Structures are given as structure tokens and as C-alpha cells.
Amino acid sequence: MPASSKRLKYSAISQNRKLAYSETDRAYIGLEDIESWTGRLLPGERAEPEGTVSIYEVGDVLFGKLRPYLAKVHLAEEAGACSTEALVLRPQRSLHPAYLKYVLLDPKRIDEINASTFGAQMPRASWDFIGNCKIFVPELTTQKAIAAFLDRETARIDKLIAKKERQVELLHKRAKQAVAELVTGATVGGMATVETGLDHIPRIPAHWSLLRAGHLFHEVAEPNTDDLPVLSVSIHTGISDRQLDDEERDRKVNLIEDRSSYKCVRPGYLAYNMMRAWQGAVGVSTVDGAVSPAYVVAKPTRDLHSLYYQFLLRTPPFIEQMRQGSKGITDFRLRLYWEQFRLIMLPVPPLEEQRRIAAEAERELAHADEVAARIVRSVALL
């Protein structure tokens, strides 16, 4: 039979078999379990749904009709149950299932279907529209050859992507290790060191000293004024020097009109999230701004380079110190109060050395980010 364009509904049938999940012993797949654009199932435990599910068989193709721009398409290799937000498409004998999967994953097809959605908050596509989309249907042997070729290419690209992702991971790991060695004095070659008696930093250069955090910083709680921007904070990068945009602010501060309970931070001030300090949520501000009441804000009490202490406190040994000082029954309830933070013993290099170390740490991380960005761009070209 020569190749032709056909409406999808003439080559695949939308199945409508639904059951209460309690009435089936089939494994369940939600849209959240399908990786966008690849059709792969994501690893990890899957939630068990309440209510009704759709039933599918081996060879059926699942298509996520909710937010179709996410391109959630999966070719079933075993029978199961899925979210009713997925269309269950059963190819006719003239349409190869793997070929149909790739047809539906075509970016132009996804754009076409996405343009048809209805509903502002929960945009959905309908089978009425999707079924009327025209698809190119070559001979079955050609379909199989196309699908096999795309399977091979996808596998090859997946291997390349995995290799590059490992490179990025290793790059960041090495950069963080280099920073940890810098801030703890492990890279000071040819100089005498002394034992500290502390597990988290056993030795330091002999010309460094040790002081508790409370001797280097003191807690401040300057009330926020309305004109100060709300700053973004990350467990990965510390305090950002940019103001949250309207969308981020609405999401992160929950539309609080009166932010008088927010705390001022000034350039050089240290701030940490009481509930996430054990994850490394600590940073130094470079601008005037405001942070959530969930943050402890501390001002230097002596002439020191605060950025050095940001890098220091974000290393694994000092994150562990903050975790040990936190109070709470479980991890998600842990809180690090100033009374415990102030007791942490911190190394104190000479001021100029603090500045030099912080500058080197910034260069290490910036170089890693630059190389990682090049790798990510190369992945996008695959």
C-alpha cells in the first residue's frame, strides 16, 4: 500500500475502558511518571491513585492530554492502569505502535495539539481534535524501519547525554572540593599546621586562629522598610543580588502585603534559613534587601571578609555542624537557632588571606559553571 496521509482516528482507536483503581491489580502510571519528550518511565516509587483509572494493554500508546506541551507520550511494554488524563490509543494493524509514538513526539505535532487546548488553569486537548490530525502513514515495513532507526539514534544520544551529565557532575564536584580545600587551609603548602582537636576541621595553618561564630558575627533584626527589595535565596548559590520578579515574589512570599516582619540585610551581612541551614542555605548579601522572618541575619563584629565565611559554611563539614546544632524531631522540622549557630568554631585566616581565598573560590566555581554551560549547550545540539 502506498504512503498516504490519514486522520489519526482512522489508524488508532481511543480506548475508554475505565475502572476504580481498587478494582484492579495493575501497576499504575501517572503523567508525572512519564519523562517529557522521551516516552521513558521515570524511576522511583509511584503514587497510588484514588478513584478511576484508564486501562491499557501491551502496545497501546499513552498520550498526556493535560498540558500537552509537556509531550508525555509512552509506548506500553506491559499492561497496566494510567491516569484518566492520558489518552489510551490502540494502533490499528496498519500502524506500528513505536512509529505512532514518534509521530506524537514530533515537536510540530505537539505544537499543533497544544494550540487546540481549552481551559486556562488546566489546559487539555481533546480526542476530537487529536483524532482529526493528519499523520503520514507509509507502508508498515517502512514504519518499522523508521521506528528502529529512531530507537537507535535515541539510544546513542542518550548515552552521549549521560556521559556529558557525568562530566558536569564531576566538574562541579571537583570545584566544590577545591573550594573546601581552599577555605580550610588544606592548600597552604609548605606552612606549619596545628591540630585543633575538632572533628570538622582537624588541622589549620599555624598562623590562623579559631573563634566561635558568635565572636565573629552578632545577630541583628533590623525591621524591613517597604522600599527594600525581597531577595531570592538558594541552597545552591546563597543570597542572590537581584530582586525577585513579581511572579517569584508572589510565589515565595505568598502575596504578603505587609512585609514589616521581614528582616533587613546589608552588604556583608550573613543570613541563613533556620529550617534549611542543614542543607547549606546560607549566604552573604552584596546589596541592601529584605529576607523572610525564617532567616537569621548576622552582622560582622570585626574586620573580616564575609564572603570567605559563605564559602566556608557551605562546605560539607560545616553544613554537618549546622545540622548537628539544629533542633527538631525529623529533618524537615530541623531549625538552627542563633544560640546554636554562634557556638560553631570557625577558622580565622588573616584578612588579606580571607579575601584571596574567597577570590580563588569564586574563580574555581565560575570556571566550573562556564565549562558546564558549554557542555549543556553541546547537549542541546544533539
Locate each region found by the language model.
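Hydrophobic stripe of amphipathic alpha-helices that form coiled-coil interfaces
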Residues: 164-167, 171-174, 178, 185, ...
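Short, conserved charged micro-motifs
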Residues: 94-100, 303-309
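Non-catalytic DNA-recognition/assembly elements of restriction-modification systems
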Residues: 1-21, 132, 136, 140, ...
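A short glycine-rich beta-alpha junction/loop motif
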Residues: 66, 80-87, 118-144, 275, ...
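A structural connector/turn signal
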Residues: 50-51, 76, 120, 132, ...
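Sequence-specific dsDNA recognition surfaces
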Residues: 9-19, 23-58, 197, 211-267
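Short, ligand-facing micro-motifs at secondary-structure edges
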Residues: 25-43, 61-83, 87, 98-102, ...
